[in-house]
Amino acid sequence: MSILQSFTFQELKNLLPNRAKDSHKGNFGKVLICAGSPGMGGAGILASEASLFCGSGLVTLVTDTSNVSSSLLRNPEVMITGVDMVEGVNIDLKIKDHNVILYGPG
């Protein structure tokens, strides 16, 4: 017996719940991603993009300031906070306000 199963995109779409017409991004999960050393923003960009693709409502990326421009160009719908990853920083991320936290991909 194989654990692999094939499906069509239409079959997958039928498994997803319908979103209410009066819903908004705050109804579909808040994701906080902390990623991206200076000049190494790819993992943060890809993680935030994957989060949006999976249906997350609100995605916030905290990354080094050198990665902010490229992150915004790739995914303007992601909220981005630039910090100095070398010096270290203490910012209020309001962790309790998020449903998912991804720390350090890449």
Can you describe what each PLM-predicted range is?
Residues 1-106:
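Small-residue (G/A/S/T)-rich helix-start motifs and N-terminal tracts that mark the onset
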